[in-house]
């Protein structure tokens, strides 16, 4: 590296250069003596330095002195005292600064200083590949002040008032540290600002791409040609690139565009630096003195063999300078020798004249040999041969090859052969040589050779570099041919399907060109093999040659790196073969007696045969003839699942537009039960079969397949058989289906057995209840159809009939019996109930047209056909449904119907009772619905609550002997009242015509006060307990002629005297032996009076009429009503058996 600051560039009078320890600063000047200034007297004073610069400038620029123009002075270093050169007693200038620090002084808006411009113009920036001449020293040079200094460098960094010459393969720019141990990491100190990193950027030469590149290391990045480059990026550099790091701009200059004043009269222009031409730079580094211009005729050398003279050089970071009588004027690298630690300082030393002269002769002789060898190599080059030969001839000082002396050529050839023989003596492994070559490519210039043998080894490395570059050039040419062949193949493959008269000629032309390229490629490959064979095993070198290592990536096509990595140029893997290891087991000495030791075979070393390390390889064999044209590269298309077509409604056939009304499980079962699915089907096959069987799924959108998949995998009636590829085969699991069917059959049998046992248990309960009822009524032989308002009195039915129906007994007693409120509706002969019964009314409410026909016409029949009555019944039904829904009950339909029917019956009975009191007659329901609907709703609510409580078993239980309910007032009226309202009694009696089956004894709500023949009876009258077992059966399907006797409870009459509490009903049996007339009391009686005979009754009440007479045989009742107490036992058992059979059947049906 070279660092020139200010006017110091143009000084020809300075002998020693002011340079830092880590800087390859080289100032090559002529030997003009300056009588006024000496280097040893330099101090830190700025005035002395400026005076020195003025003196040097006056000697160099006489024209400027004539014009008396002031010359700008530049400071060499920054204010850091460590960066200022120190003067020692022996004239050795040292510096603690590791890096060159540009002093960026303000220029007051001016451009680059004139001194810098003059320096860059006068200092010939000579590329390494041209005009690198070694000037031999002569005695006349002491007085020669016209020789201009020359600086050889790879590139140059032009700062605003600072110039940096790049003379190594790698330059690091950044900010130096105050720590002396870290200062060798930075070559160019840009600034002390924190925006610049310690190692901010690195400029290096890339041998792979053969160009300079810059790699950004700082986190703040940099600008290259006003384009920001962030950290971690590496971009190529060309001549003239403007770089800015922080606020420090500079320009990168390459020698290709640098003007050369000395060669303006020559035709050839400067070429860009080629790394293979590093020989000139290396030879200049070894040249310690300038050499004169070579004459057109080269002088013959006195000896045939190169003399090996020791070179007196310092490895302790010092540059050796000749004595003042022999000044040094040479190319810049010869004035600066970099060590591996980059710690070179300027120093002066005196050596004997004889040693210096011998060393110069040896170096010149070696340089001449190298040039001739390069010339012989250049003759074999096919590309750029003329430029290379002209360059070599120029270095040799001749204009053509013919001017070279043949005798000298033979001599030189002999000397070259001796050098080659000397190289052959130091042959090494090719791997070591190649590794050393890589080290050489990645290192900077290093001059640590102290003898001639080291110099010759360095020349062998340079030769190896040259051959490597030629090898890489051939690789690049082969690559270019391959790319051209690829393009031709593509064009031919495109033209082949379009062959016609027009394209035939073009195709033939492409074929011809292709053959030529293939022939050229074979030649290049042959030449490459020759170069590979001639890549000799070069002598080893212990240290790198070129200073700092540069991070240079090897080219991808370089044969050197491929061979280092185990690959040859053909692409085959070359397996490393280490020497086979020898495993030697140590033999221990045995001290026991020989007789106690068994004979053992001698221990032998275990060796491994070499054949085990030979890597096997194989290549495919084919009998097919290679095609003439390359196969077009077929792109691998990934299988993409095409979406299903969406059918419109018009595209779907009419029968397949509606979804089948069956489940997926049934579909899958139908598919798997076919013969085709005997061995199992995969899921996709099942879905396809479903599409065929049910075409609706062929046209519908996707998504139902997931349900099929889930149903198959998680339903136990399907089982997996085996795998077909990666999918399972599914079939019906017959074992599981049979097992589940058996379980179902067993459950059904168990349910039937439980139902039968329950029926038997219910039968036992009913028999027990019947027995208890029979025991509680031993003397009630005659049916109780009349209730006396007094206790302990019984009135025969015929006597009651004479009082209640004296005017109409002859017409109605033959076909019906008026048993009061609780008379039975079933005759012995199976006659139907009256037309005005509650069953007929409920049938009308439900709209049932099959109302049972009546056997006789009664006065209440016209009331059922009245529209007002129907309207009232509809109102009751609607209101009752509203009340039932408001309770949010969860009973089944049969239970709900039973509850509603029971509530309707109770409501109608209560309404008729209230209407009778109010004198409404037959139209009591209609009257109350029209006049007081809120009372009807209240009665409905009470009746529904009662029905629900009875059903749930919450109602209170009555005593074991059922009490006789009290008669309603209309049943206890006098004969005159009965005649005045002839239809009231039948209407009231119809309320009890519904077949019911209540619990044993449960009283209903009582009517508060009732009048019997004008007498106020304060106690509540017990009403019948109406329990409806099935509303539907009782209303519409139960046989009217033969109702079930167990559904009717024997009612009891209960009359409450005035002195008793109205909430407690009193059960009193009706006497049968004292027939007395019914008086009309005027006030409550303390005791019941004795009844006399009723008028027209006869002497006394005898036993009832014969039971066997049919109805209508006599004027009185043919037989009393049949109750549970007086009904024959065999009939009750038969009817109970029929009812239990029906209930058992219903329970079994529910269970199933």
Curated annotation (Swiss-Prot):
Record PANTHER family: DIADENOSINE 5',5'''-P1,P4-TETRAPHOSPHATE PHOSPHORYLASE, DIADENOSINE 5',5'''-P1,P4-TETRAPHOSPHATE PHOSPHORYLASE 2-RELATED
Function: In complex with IFH1, acts as a transcriptional regulator of rRNA and ribosomal protein genes. The FHL1-IFH1 complex is targeted to the ribosomal protein genes by the DNA-binding factor TBF1.
UniProt KW Translocase keyword: no
Protein name as annotated: Fork-head transcriptional regulator FHL1
UniProt feature, compositional bias: Basic and acidic residues: 64-83
Gene that this sequence comes from: FHL1
Keyword Transcription regulation applies: yes
Keywords: Coiled coil, DNA-binding, Nucleus, Transcription, Transcription regulation
Any Gene Ontology CC annotation: nucleus
DNA-binding region: 659-756
């Amino acid at each position: 590296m070279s660092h020139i600051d200010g006017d110091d560039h143009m000084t020809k009078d300075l002998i020693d250069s002011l340079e830092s320890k880590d800087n390859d600063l080289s100032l090559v000047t002529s030997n003009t003596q300056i009588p006024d200034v000496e280097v040893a007297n330099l101090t830190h004073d700025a005035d002395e330095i400026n005076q020195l610069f003025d003196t040097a400038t006056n000697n160099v620029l006489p024209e400027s002195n004539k014009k008396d123009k002031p010359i700008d002075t530049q400071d060499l270093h920054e204010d850091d005292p460590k960066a200022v050169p120190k003067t020692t007693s022996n004239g050795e200038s040292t510096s603690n600064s590791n890096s060159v620090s540009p002093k960026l002084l303000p220029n007051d808006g001016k451009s680059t200083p004139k001194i810098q411009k003059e320096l860059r113009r006068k200092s010939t920036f000579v590329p390494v590949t041209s005009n690198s001449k070694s000037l031999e020293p002569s005695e006349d040079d002491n007085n020669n002040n016209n020789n201009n200094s020359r600086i050889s460098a790879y590139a140059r960094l032009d700062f605003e008032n600072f110039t940096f010459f790049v003379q190594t393969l790698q330059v690091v720019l950044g900010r130096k540290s105050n720590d002396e141990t870290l200062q060798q990491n930075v070559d160019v100190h840009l600034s002390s600002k924190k925006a610049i990193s310690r190692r901010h950027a690195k400029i290096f030469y890339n041998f792979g791409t053969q160009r300079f590149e810059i790699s950004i290391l700082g986190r703040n990045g940099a600008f290259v040609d006003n384009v920001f480059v962030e950290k971690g990026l590496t971009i190529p550099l060309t001549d003239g690139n403007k770089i800015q790091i922080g606020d420090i701009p500079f320009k990168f200059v390459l020698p290709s565009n640098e003007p050369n004043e000395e060669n303006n009269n020559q035709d050839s222009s400067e070429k860009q630096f080629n790394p293979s031409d590093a020989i000139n730079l290396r030879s200049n580094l070894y040249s310690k003195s300038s050499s004169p211009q070579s004459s057109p005729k080269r002088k013959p050398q006195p000896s045939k063999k190169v003399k090996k003279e020791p070179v007196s050089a310092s490895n302790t970071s010092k540059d050796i300078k000749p004595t003042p009588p022999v000044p040094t004027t040479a190319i810049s690298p010869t004035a600066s020798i970099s060590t591996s630690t980059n710690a070179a300082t300027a120093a002066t030393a005196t050596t004997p004249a004889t040693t210096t002269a011998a060393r110069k002769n040896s170096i010149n002789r070696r340089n001449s040999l190298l040039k001739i060898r390069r010339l012989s190599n250049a003759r074999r080059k096919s590309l750029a041969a003329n430029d290379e030969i002209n360059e070599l001839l120029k270095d040799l000082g001749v204009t053509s090859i013919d001017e070279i002396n043949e005798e000298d050529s033979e001599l030189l050839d002999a000397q070259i052969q001796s050098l080659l023989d000397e190289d052959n003596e130091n042959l090494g492994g090719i791997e070591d040589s190649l590794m050393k070559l890589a080290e050489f490519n990645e290192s900077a210039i290093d001059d640590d050779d102290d003898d001639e043998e080291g110099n010759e080894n360095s020349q062998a490395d340079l030769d190896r570099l040259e051959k490597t570059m030629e090898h890489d050039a051939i690789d690049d040419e082969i690559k270019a041919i391959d790319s051209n062949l690829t393009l031709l193949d593509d064009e031919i493959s495109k033209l082949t399907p379009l062959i016609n008269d027009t394209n035939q000629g073009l195709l033939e032309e492409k074929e011809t060109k292709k053959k030529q390229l293939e022939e050229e490629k074979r030649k290049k490959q042959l030449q490459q093999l020759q170069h590979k064979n001639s890549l000799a095993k070069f002598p080893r070198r212990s240290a790198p040659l070129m200073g700092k290592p540069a991070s240079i990536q090897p080219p991808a096509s370089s044969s050197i790196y491929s061979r280092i990595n185990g690959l040859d140029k053909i692409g085959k893997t070359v397996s490393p073969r280490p020497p086979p290891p020898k495993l030697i087991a140590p033999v221990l000495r045995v001290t026991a007696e020989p007789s106690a030791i068994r004979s053992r075979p001698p221990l032998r070393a275990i060796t491994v045969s070499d054949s085990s390390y030979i890597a096997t390889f194989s290549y495919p064999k084919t009998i097919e003839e290679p095609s003439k044209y390359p196969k077009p590269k077929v792109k691998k298309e990934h299988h993409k699942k095409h979406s299903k077509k969406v059918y419109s409604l018009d595209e779907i056939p009419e029968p397949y537009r509606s979804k089948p009304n069956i489940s997926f499980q049934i579909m899958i079962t139908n598919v798997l039960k076919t013969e085709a699915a005997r061995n199992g089907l995969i899921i996709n096959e099942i879905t396809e079969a479903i599409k065929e069987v049910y075409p609706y799924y062929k046209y519908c959108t996707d998504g139902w397949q997931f349900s099929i998949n889930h149903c198959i995998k998680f339903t136990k009636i399907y089982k997996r058989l085996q795998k077909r590829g990666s999918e399972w085969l599914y079939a019906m699991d017959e074992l599981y289906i049979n097992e589940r069917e058996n379980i179902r059959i067993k459950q059904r049998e168990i349910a039937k057995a439980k139902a039968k046992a329950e029926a038997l248990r219910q039968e036992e309960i009913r028999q027990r209840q019947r027995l208890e009822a029979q025991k509680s009524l031993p003397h009630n032989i005659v049916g109780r159809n009349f209730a006396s308002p007094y206790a302990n009195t019984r009135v025969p039915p015929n006597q009651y009939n004479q009082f209640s129906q004296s005017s109409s007994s002859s017409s109605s007693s033959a076909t019906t019996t008026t048993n009061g409120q609780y008379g039975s509706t079933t005759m012995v002969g199976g006659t139907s109930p009256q037309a005005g019964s509650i069953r007929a009314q409920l049938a009308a409410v439900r709209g049932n047209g099959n109302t049972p026909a009546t056997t006789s016409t009664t006065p209440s029949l016209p009331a059922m056909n009245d529209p007002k009555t129907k309207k009232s019944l509809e109102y009751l039904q609607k209101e009752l449904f509203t009340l039932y829904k408001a309770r949010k009950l969860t009973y089944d339909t049969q239970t709900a119907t039973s509850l509603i029917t029971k509530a309707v019956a109770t409501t109608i009975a209560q309404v008729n009772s209230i209407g009778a009191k109010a004198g409404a007659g037959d139209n009591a329901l209609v009257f109350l619905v029209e006049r007081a609907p809120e009372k009807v709703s209240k009665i409905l609510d009470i009746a529904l609550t009662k029905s629900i409580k009875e059903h749930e078993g919450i109602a209170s239980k009555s005593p074991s002997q059922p009490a006789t309910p009290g008669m309603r007032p209309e049943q206890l009226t006098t004969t005159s009242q009965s005649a005045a309202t002839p239809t009231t009694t039948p209407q009231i009696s119809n309320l009890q015509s519904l077949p019911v089956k209540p619990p044993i004894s449960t009283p209903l709500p009582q009517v508060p006060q009732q009048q019997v023949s004008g007498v106020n009876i304060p106690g509540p009258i017990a009403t019948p307990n109406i329990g409806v077992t099935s509303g539907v059966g009782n209303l519409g399907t139960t046989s009217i002629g033969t109702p079930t006797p167990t559904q009717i409870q024997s009612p009891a009459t209960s009359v409450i005297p005035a002195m008793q509490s109205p909430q407690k009903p009193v059960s009193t049996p009706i006497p049968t032996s004292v027939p007395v007339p019914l008086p009309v009391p005027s006030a409550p009686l303390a005791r019941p009076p004795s009844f006399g005979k009723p008028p027209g009754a006869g002497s006394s009440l005898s036993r009832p009429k014969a039971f066997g007479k049919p109805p209508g045989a006599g004027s009185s009742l043919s037989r009393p009503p049949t109750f549970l107490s007086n009904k024959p036992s065999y009939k009750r058992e038969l009817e109970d058996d029929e009812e239990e059979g029906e209930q058992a059947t219903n329970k079994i049906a529910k269970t199933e």
